[in-house]
Every structure is written in C-alpha cells, then in structure tokens.
Amino acid sequence: MLEKEREKFLEDKFQAFVKNYALTNREQDVLRLLLSSDESVQVIAEQLYISRAALYRYMASLNEKTETKSRIGLLQFYYSWKQP
C-alpha cells in the first residue's frame, strides 16, 4: 500500500509541476525521461524518437520555463520544488 501512495504522491507532484510551468506534452515526456534516467542525451533522444538537437531545444525550453541553466539544475529544481 505504501508503494501505491508513494507513486500517487509522485504523480500528483509531477502533474502540479506540469500545470504550474505550463509544460507541453513533449516537454512532459522529456522531463519524465530526464527524471527517470541518467542516460546520455543521445540515448534519451533515441527513446523519444527525436534528434539530439530537438531534445536540446526541449531541454532549453524547460530551463527557460523553470529559470534553470542546466540538466542538473532542472533536476535539482524539480526535486526541491514544493507545490504552491
């Protein structure tokens, strides 16, 4: 039961973050993979069936919306973010 509650909490946080920062569907896909994987940009791009350049554009958009400057900064920001 605890695992289901944890999953619900994490999904609720993700959805609140998405809403708060007005993320597009593709930005959500990118963020989910960045959160769940420490793979290289090339591998993540392949998993999303997009080019590395496209992935970098989505990451830049996420950084702009969250006022972060890097992949690591984005992840740190997400994990420390508190729902308003």
Regions found by a protein language model. Give the residues of each.
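Regulatory hinge/linker segments at domain boundaries
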Residues: R6-R26
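Short acidic alpha-helix initiation/capping motifs at coil-to-helix transition points
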Residues: R6-E11, S36, A53-A54
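Short helix-to-turn junction characteristic of helix-turn-helix DNA-binding domains
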Residues: L34-D38, Y78
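Basic, Lys/Arg-enriched C-terminal extension of HTH/homeodomain DNA-binding domains
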Residues: E3-K4, F17, A60-P84
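The N-cap/first-turn positions of alpha helices
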Residues: R26-E27, V41
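Pre-recognition alpha-helix immediately N-terminal to the DNA-recognition helix
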Residues: Q28-R32, G73
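Recognition helix of helix-turn-helix DNA-binding domains
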Residues: D38-G73
